[in-house]
Amino acid sequence: MAEPGHNPHPSARDGGKTERRTPRLLWLLLWAGTTFQVTLGTGPELHACKESEYHFEYTACDSTGSRWRVAVPHSPGLCTSLPDPVKGTECSFSCNAGEFLDMKDQSCKPCAEGRYSLGTGIRFDEWDELPHGFASLSANLEVDDSISESTENCTSSKWVPRGDYIASNTDECTATLMYAVNLKQSGTVNFEYYYPDSSIIFEFFVQNDQCQPSADDSRWMKTTEKGWVELNRGNNVLYWRTTAFSVWSKVSKPVLVRNIAITGVAYTSECFPCKPGTYAAKQGSPFCKLCPANYYSNKGETSCHPCDADKYSEKGSSTCKVRPACTDKDYFYTHTACDAQGETQLMYKWAIPKICGEDLEGAVKLPASGVKTRCPPCNPGFFKTDNSTCEPCPYGSYSNGSDCTHCPAGTEPAVGFEYKWWNTLPSNMETTVLSGINFEYKGLTGWEVAGDHIYTAVGASDNDFMILTLVVPGFRPPQSVVADTENKEVARITFVFETICSVNCELYFMVGMNSRTNTPVETWKGTKGKQSYTYTIEENATVSFTWAFQRTTLHETGRKYTNDVAKIYSINVTNVMGGVASYCRPCALEASDLGSSCTSCPAGHYINRDSGTCHLCPSNTILKAHQPYGAQACVPCGPGTKNNKIHSLCYNDCTFSRNTPSRIFNYNFSALAGTVSLAGVPSFTSKGLKYFHHFTLSLCGNQGKKMAVCTDNVTDLRIPDGEAGFSKSVTAYVCQVVIIPSEVMGYKAGVSSQPVSLADRLVGVSTDMTLEGIVSPVELFHPETSGIPDIVFFFRSNDVTQSCSSGRSTTIRLRCNPMKAAPGTLRLPSMCSDGTCDGCNFHFLWESVAACPLCSASDYHTFVSSCVAGIQKTTYMWREPKLCSGGISLPEQRVTICKTIDFWLKVGISAGTCTAILLTVLTCYFWKKNQKLEYKYSKLVMNATLKDCDLPAADSCAIMEGEDVEDDFIFTSKKSLFGKIKSFTSKRTPDGFDSVPLKTSSGGPDMDM
């Protein structure tokens, strides 16, 4: 023991005199130890440190790559006389897997039995609690101040250890799992994860000691798989971060992470004991093996121990459980394959693994097997062989499950798969069980055949997923479908099913393309009666259809609800490449040297069943692409629409006409033909997550091509525009997507999720409020006041869901508003801020000047001015308010030459004068004519007086009784103008006779009057 004031290490004070340069950190440690001894020198005497009271550590590496090994006490101040520092191994030194670095002699030694090591790495595979060094943090996203009082706290939203793995949060909070590690050399981090739900954002990234993130190539997790990321030398902080945003009632499924392994730590000073349920029988083991079923092990075991006869255990168990008595929930029934006599046997089997005891009190016995029944017929398209097996009919023939029959002339087989008899599992189907505890496949049978249906078998636990998969290599759609770029339907799958459940069971239907991860399409919860479901395949690729049934989501083992089952009665897939046929359909005939053969009709042509010839569909009709037989296959288009070039769809060419008794209103919506977007009002979840619905619309034109695109970028926020990648993209006339703003998530781009098609087919365009069952309530929007009725576009979606059994519908109401320049303004119903009041029927109001009718001559006034200085102007002005757009232009002002009032007055006087002269001339003319008649009459009177003379008979007219005798004598002698006027003014005598002087003709006798 050193005396007070004496320093046993003078070199600590005079380090500059030594010839060997000792690292500064080493001198600091030595000086601290000496000072510590001097300070306590007056206290009780300390004993020399034993090997169990200290451990060795390396100092930090210097610039030359060197380090020192120093002894560090477990509890400072309890002992003294620690070993002197010695030069350590190189900083890059490491041991192999299965070895550890013995710090006492600084050499690698193999791990003992029951232990393992990764050499230069560490592994985390036990998650009963959060391992040392890990941290789980949670945080709210952007929370609106107005709802802060009702916002739930996020402090409990963290990653939760669950034994074999750690699970993420499932709410709208952000949960982060962190681990910091210092690497002596470049290494990797490797982990397995289960990422089943796209409504969760899952990202993994690494930051260095300057808090700078590494390249984000692997930041966004795409699918369930094993992942690894390279790590740089130095400090690395690993982040696993999740954020759920299921804005609907659906509860997201958590992300699961397990088996995290990190390499590059340079050395491991000890081996890790095998966790319970595993063992390592040999020295130098890099990993521990799982105990088989009905065996168990404790921590650090070299072998597994068998369970007692009355106990059992699952694979990798640390304890054995008491076997319960067998019940009817522990066995299931199935059917054997048909024998040579065409019979099948009903067989009862214990569920695997068998955990119950038959000999226990109250245990049930396995029912007797072997009851024979007649085999059901083969599935359509198959025939029964001599040994009672079913084989597919060759191409060109069909069957209903019995014998194969060649298709008649003029027909071709309708290939597909139709399964409705379940005596054996079809060759293109397989079944398995996925553990609901550790999410590993167990290699068990998940579905069993039962004659007229297939049902879920008994699993190892009620939360296991009973999986059934059907793989289709590809499709062979009709040529008319291939030519139609807008009709994406290449095939359909229809299945009939039911579920019988006593708790919260779930049946999932999933679809995977080209071996990619299955995407959930539809989910049914609880008991569902026997019903049919149809899904449309829109991509010609290798497709896998998966049905997964889970009896309960509770995280516990046991069989309590084995009577909860899912049954599938039939599965029908159309247009399958290499499929079989249950019937033959008519085809178009093509003449050849070998006779007639089937061929495809051109797009838009239907097949005449009798002649096998192709005929073009009439105008304004479309062809049923998958049933092009007969004239009835041509379906009329709705009002206001027309067919495209190949008669595959009805569309509106951005024009519309409306007839009224007074005029015809024409419309042109070309200014509205592009895509437009509309965001709904912001909403908030219970955790305060801000989101809104975003709509994209394409109204008309483009030959009916769907222009609105909505994308799900949750699984990969880095995909370029136009590339599908792992994202789900929806193309329609109207689509909807849920958007979380970029300022909320902290990403460069906003997060879009759950794209939905709202309009796949244009039903018609009309001013009516109802069309083919689709209603556009006028009361949803403020009433129009212009007097011009709204034009309504009626759309329908092909998506059929449980809540929307008839599919979704969309109405877009176009309203004339001269104050809204094109393209105008889109509005949502005020009482339904998300565009729908029931989740199935969506409504939009589009106000624009482009929605007004085209201008015509009826839309302007004509004003004619007075004649000023010989000029008259004609002016045209629009009627107010102007409720038209486009069409004819307002005519320019017209200027014409005109005559003043003075001119017309002169014309009138001249015309009057001429008229007076004309009347005078006419008067004279008729007067003269009258004088001639007067003369003739006078002559007749003179002849009448010669009664008794021998004169010739008078040439006169008879005088009727009561008539006056008036004789006018016409004098042959000419008179002057004055004499004519005087004669004209003479008057008759009072007795009614005129005094006429008579002149006797020459040579005649004198007569007395």
Swiss-Prot record:
Residues modified by carbohydrate are 153, 387, 400
Pfam families for the chain: ELAPOR1_C (PF23089), GBD_ELAPOR1 (PF23031), GBD_ELAPOR1-like_3rd (PF23032), MRH_ELAPOR1_9th (PF23087), TNFR_ELAPOR1_6th (PF23091)
**Keywords of the record:** Autophagy, Cell membrane, Disulfide bond, Endoplasmic reticulum, Endosome, Glycoprotein, Golgi apparatus, Lysosome, Membrane, Signal, Transmembrane, Transmembrane helix
Query: InterPro entries under this entry?
Result: Elapor1-like_3rd (IPR056609), Elapor1/2 (IPR039181), Elapor1/2_C (IPR056606), Elapor1/2_GBD (IPR056608), Elapor1/2_MRH (IPR056607), Elapor1/2_TNFR-like (IPR056610), Growth_fac_rcpt_cys_sf (IPR009030), Man6P_isomerase_rcpt-bd_dom_sf (IPR009011)
Cystine connections: 274-291, 304-326, 307-338, 654-700, 710-735, 804-840, 816-852
Intracellular or extracellular location(s) = Cell membrane; Late endosome membrane; Golgi apparatus, trans-Golgi network membrane; Lysosome membrane
- Which PROSITE patterns does this entry report, sorted A to Z? MRH
In this UniProt entry, which residues form the Cytoplasmic topological domain(s)? 928-1009
| Domain MRH stretches | 652-854
Question: GO biological process: any one?
Answer: autophagy
Segments on the Extracellular side according to the record's topology features: 36-906
Can you supply one Gene Ontology CC term for this chain's record?
lysosomal membrane
Domain of life of the native organism: Eukaryota
Which family, according to the similarity comment?
A: Belongs to the ELAPOR family.
Q: What is the protein name for this chain?
A: Endosome/lysosome-associated apoptosis and autophagy regulator 1
